[in-house]
Design a protein with these regions (language model features):
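Charged, glycine-interspersed solvent-exposed loop segments at helix/strand-loop junctions
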Residues: 173-271, 420-502, 506-516
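Short, structured coil segments at secondary-structure junctions
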Residues: 46, 148-149, 179, 257-258, ...
């Protein structure tokens, strides 16, 4: 019997050791596979190469690299704005690259991001090289971007979907009533409409006014850009949209001056070969290949480029079901590190955020203020830098925005939920102090409790006004007149004193160099992207769950995200009253 147990024990240990060994071998093989998939060999372009930019996917400032996406074979593509701009710049300077081919697709991009790419393409054309665009169809944002091309081609059965801008707000009040959930709301700002979806069944007059104002301003910029590039009147562009001519066929788009010719894709390829003098096969280069040619040159003082993209949330509130990037207190830590780094002479902080947690925004604001005492910091605003995003920005030496950036929204709110009696759920409480169960969702709030929370919200708003007034050299009264939670475009914000100048990331870098009195400098990009091992071990589960939800919900996933954000974002919020959908 003793020998039998020895045999069993030895066999068990052998199995455990064997499985452990096989697991380690399997893990190393997986790491090697992913590393091989993500490694990029050195790219050397041949003469007469054309940079091909596939406008298909979602544009993000600095998307986190996800090597696991290659294994999951995810269809959704995230396009790096940083990489696209770098590739266009390199293509203009490299004599081996003759032109750019814009391949229109299903592009999701904010209007400010599209402005940045459009400006880069216009600068590229000054090199004398060509830009050609083709689409089976052109979405509105994609056409705005491609309209800068020398020649625009459209599939004979295609459409230019230039119809105008709209804004849709989802209201959950009816759903809350059916579920027996009531909302306790505390806010400051006539235009702070973030709470309206949970209180009203349609837009308030103030919210409707601000939305109409900013979408009309952005539409005006789009129309002017298209008209200028296509050498047509703004009235003609408006006519195309107003009369629904997107549905009149490709020939109508040609007649109106929006498109040059109808062509199928092989004919466009042949046209490009004629431009480059290639008889048989055209050599194309991808964005990542051309961007890889931009290697740092020389040495010297450094300007740090730091990205702040996504919702502002406490670290512990990050949801595993949310695939979007977020801003946490980690950004404050990075600003401290940059302040103490003697090699860094200036900082450019790129903000693309609708805002979020007031407390986290205040912590980051503090470190912007502290860094400014040691070295200049310039803000570059992306598609949105509003509410908490603007809170962070207001302390900087200088703020640069695109004309279509959504910013401002200086206001705060907080939401508490209460389960209504009709659910049939009751509770009883024993407490030591009057406010020990403040925020209890099982009972109505007392007048005293409401007064306390409204006072806290108003205090946060006064703090917000004070931060902006100090940072922008204005009085709190002046800030209050343009605050009240109202959203402004970048061009409006310049007129109001909330932004210094209009421009893109490159202008912000140039301004930082000027403030630091640097003639020669290097750019040091500060990244928070996860390492391969972090991707493999830390986020696999949440990512799979999020992808399953996205696959199941489809386009409605964004509404789930909105409700999820409201759930995890406790406390006072400094956030845009809605999410920004791409053009």
């Amino acid at each position: 019997m003793k020998a039998f147990f020895k045999t069993i024990l030895a066999s068990t240990i052998g199995v455990i050791v064997g499985l452990t060994f096989m697991g380690i071998i399997g893990l190393l093989a997986l790491v090697g596979l992913v590393a091989g998939l993500t490694s990029t060999p050195t790219y050397v372009p041949s003469n007469n190469t054309v940079l091909r930019i596939d406008l298909n996917g979602t544009i993000a400032d600095n998307p986190a690299e996800d090597p696991l996406a290659l294994l999951w074979k995810e269809d959704e593509t995230t396009l790096s704005l940083k990489e696209i701009l770098k590739a266009i710049k390199v293509a203009g300077e490299d004599p081996r690259i003759n032109g750019i081919y814009l391949r229109a697709g299903n592009l999701d991009g904010g209007s400010a991001s599209l402005q940045s790419i459009r400006r880069a393409l216009e600068a590229f054309k000054e090199s004398g090289k060509f830009v050609v665009a083709y689409g089976d169809n052109y979405t509105q944002g994609c056409y705005y971007l491609c309209s800068v091309a020398d020649r625009l081609f459209l599939n004979p059965q295609g459409m230019v979907m230039l119809n105008g801008l709209s804004s849709q707000t989802m209201f959950f009040t009816g759903l809350m009533e059916k579920l027996g959930v009531e909302m306790e709301v505390f806010k400051v700002g006539s235009y702070k409409g973030a709470v309206e979806p949970f209180l009203l069944k349609k837009l308030s007059d103030e919210n409707r006014e601000q939305i109409q104002s900013y979408i009309s301003t952005i539409w005006g910029h789009l129309v002017e850009g298209i008209a200028s590039s296509r050498r047509m009147s703004t009235d003609a562009v408006e006519q195309f949209a107003n009369e629904g001519l997107a549905f009149a066929g490709a020939q109508k788009a040609i007649d109106m001056g929006l498109i040059d010719e109808q062509k199928y894709q092989p004919e466009v390829d042949r046209f490009i070969r004629e431009q480059t003098g290639q008889e048989n096969k055209q050599s194309y280069a991808s964005v990542s290949e051309v961007a890889s040619l931009d290697t740092p040159k020389g040495s010297g003082p450094k300007i740090a480029l730091l990205y702040a993209e996504g919702e502002i949330v406490p670290r512990q509130s990050v949801s595993g079901y949310d695939l979007s990037q977020v801003i946490t207190e980690r950004l404050a830590d990075q600003l401290i590190e940059l302040k103490e780094d003697k090699e860094i002479k200036a900082v450019v902080l790129r903000i693309n955020s609708p805002g979020g947690s007031f407390q986290v925004a205040d912590q980051i604001w503090r470190q912007v203020e502290e860094l400014k005492k040691e070295k200049p910091i310039v803000i570059s605003m992306g598609d949105a830098a509003a509410s908490g995003g603007y809170y962070i920005a207001c302390a900087a030496n200088r703020i640069i925005a695109e004309s279509n950036t959504l910013t401002g929204s200086i206001g705060v709110f907080s939401l508490l939920t209460r389960l209504a009696d009709k659910l049939g759920i009751g509770s009883d409480v024993v407490k030591t102090n009057p406010y020990a169960d403040l925020g209890n969702s099982m009972r109505p709030m007392s007048a005293d409790e409401r007064a306390l929370l409204q006072h806290q919200t108003e205090y946060a708003y006064r703090t917000f006004l004070s931060r902006c007034a100090d940072g922008r050299s204005m009085t709190t009264e002046q800030v209050d007149r343009v605050a009240q939670g109202r959203v402004w475009t970048g061009s409006q914000a310049v007129d109001l004193g909330l932004v210094d100048d209009l421009g893109g990331l490159q202008q912000a870098i140039s301004d930082a160099a000027e403030l630091a009195q640097l003639d020669h400098y290097q750019i040091k990009e500060i990244t928070t992207n996860k390492s391969l091992f972090e991707e493999l071990f830390a986020t696999t589960g949440p990512t799979i769950k999020a992808n399953l939800l996205r696959s199941f919900l489809g386009d409605d996933f964004i509404y789930y995200q909105t409700l999820q954000q409201m759930r995890v974002n406790s406390g006072i919020q400094a956030r845009l009253p809605y999410d920004i959908r791409p053009l």
